[in-house]
Every structure is written in C-alpha cells, then in structure tokens.
C-alpha cells in the first residue's frame, strides 16, 4: 500500500478513520487506528452530552470533553491523531481552538465551508483538511 501524505504528515497505512459522532469515534478507536499506522480521528460532535458532569453548560462540557479525549488518545497512541469538527456546529470555533490548544496533528472539517478556520491557525501549528463528499471520494479513488 502507498503511504498517505497530507502536508508533513505521513500515515504508513493509507486509512483515515471516520470521525463518527456522537460517542463512536473517541480516544479508544482513534488511538487504536493511529497505533496501527493510520490516522485516528476523534469526533467533536456531541461531546457535551457525554461530558455533562464536567459542566452544566453544553458548550463548555463539549470543549472540556474534547480536550480530555485528545489527551487520552495521545497517552495511548504513538501515531497521527486528528479531530473531525463539523462547520455546522454552533461551537465550531471553540472546538477548533481546543483542538489546536491540545496540539492535534490534523483537523478535518466538513458540513459547511470553514471560511474562518485559517484565522485560528498559526504557521505550522496544525494541518487542516476541508472536505466535501465528492472530494473525499476522489481522494479515495486516487489511493486505489
């Protein structure tokens, strides 16, 4: 199989695990995929529901939960860890900022146009991928 290269990141196994929410793509799955050589992805969607004990405020609980999941994945994994943040989420900006602060390797954004995403990034801070279904299918076809 070909190595998957996205920016400076190189995944030995050309697999990007889907960021499936709510509560499916968390640190356990993402770290397992990363340890096998693929890109493990944590879904940022709905974490406020799973981490409601951390804060009564849904947005705050979601951001605290995302930070916790990224840290757990980092503890378990030696490979590439990313986050999937849907642009359509009302707390998109906060989730992106949390992902950057926690030093994820890559942010995937879909479900809208992430027009303000570049404003959150510093040079060489994190790789970002914006995707649509068509672009994702084209990328997969190129790998095969």
Descriptions of predicted regions:
Residues 60-62, 127, 143:
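Short alpha-helix boundary/capping motifs
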């Amino acid at each position: 199989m070909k190595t998957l290269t996205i920016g400076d990141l190189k995944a030995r196994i050309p697999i990007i695990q889907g960021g499936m929410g709510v509560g499916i793509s968390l640190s356990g799955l993402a770290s397992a995929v990363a340890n096998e050589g693929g890109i493990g992805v944590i879904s940022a969607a709905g974490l406020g529901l799973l981490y409601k004990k951390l804060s009564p405020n849904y947005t705050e609980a979601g951001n605290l939960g995302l930070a916790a999941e990224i840290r757990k994945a980092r503890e378990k994994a030696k490979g590439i860890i990313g986050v999937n943040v849907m642009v359509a989420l009302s707390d998109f900006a906060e989730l992106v900022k949390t992902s950057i602060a926690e030093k994820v390797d890559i942010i995937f954004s879909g479900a809208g146009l992430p027009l303000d995403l570049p404003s959150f990034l510093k040079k060489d801070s994190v790789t970002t991928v914006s995707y649509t279904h068509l672009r994702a299918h084209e990328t997969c076809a190129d790998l095969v």
